[in-house]
Swiss-Prot record:
The chain crosses the membrane at residues 276-296. The lineage of its organism: Eukaryota, Viridiplantae, Streptophyta, Embryophyta, Tracheophyta. The gene is SYP132. Residues 1-28, 107-132 are annotated as: Disordered. It comes from Oryza sativa subsp. japonica (Rice). Gene3D superfamilies: 1.20.5.110, 1.20.58.70. This is Syntaxin-132. It is found in: Cell membrane.
Amino acid sequence: MNNLLTDSFELPRGGSSRDGDIEMGMQADPSDNLKGFLKKVDAIESLIAKLTNLLHKLQTANEESKAVTKARDMKAIKQRMEKDIDEVGKIARMAKTKVDELEKDNLSNRQKPGCGKGSAVDRSREQTTGAVKKKLKERMDDFQVLREAIRQEYRDVVERRVFTVTGSRPDEETVDNLIETGRSEQIFQEAIQQQGRGQILDTVAEIQERHDAVRDLERKLLELQQIFMDMAVLVDAQGDMINNIETHVSNATNHIQQGVSALQNAKKLQKNSRKWMCYAIILLLIIVVIIVVAVIQPWKKGA
């Protein structure tokens, strides 16, 4: 990213920063202005990379949980996932704080010579900040997708457990009640009498542990969503602003191109008009000469 933004501001070969300062009224080199800014951007992107790594760990743990049939195993996975989600919350808050600082820094930077609103430096900073915020929003969306997946897969697992124990598929009301309360012993009363209490109680304990895990994980993921909400609003607003700027630039470019085309056509018409005027004058002169010759008839005088 550093190369992408700083290459546009490199001095011409053979030139010196001092000469540039004199020509620009002792303004700072734009590439120097961006160096500190890009370090802050890199720090935020490093945090986003950590969020991505934690997201993958949570997705893997969620896949593992589908095959678990023991309460203690489910509890161990839950503890791992809770630890990772807590870490996600910590990193997300850090990232949000750094983005807020970046935006404040962008505003204060506009007070520097040559860095005012709309300048090349200002546009680069704004666009880069917007891109970083967009990445954070995308990661936020990924965590919410994970939350929905955990909830749906929990429902699927509960249905399978009831079917495995009872031999019949539960209706939606039964599944909803299990998801809401986690209490399944009453549903398995007949199976307990037929298969024995010990074996069924393992399934009951696993369903209860899974219920508690999903409830706690969902609560933590909802807390994450709140952390990102303000940022999402800012990203959308800045996205609209950047789109408007791009639209205005595109419209201005189109108008300029139309103007150039019209000017070229006018020059072409003017050139053609002059050419035909010359032809008309020559033709008129020829006609005049013919008339004069016809009137004077110099060949008769000679005779």
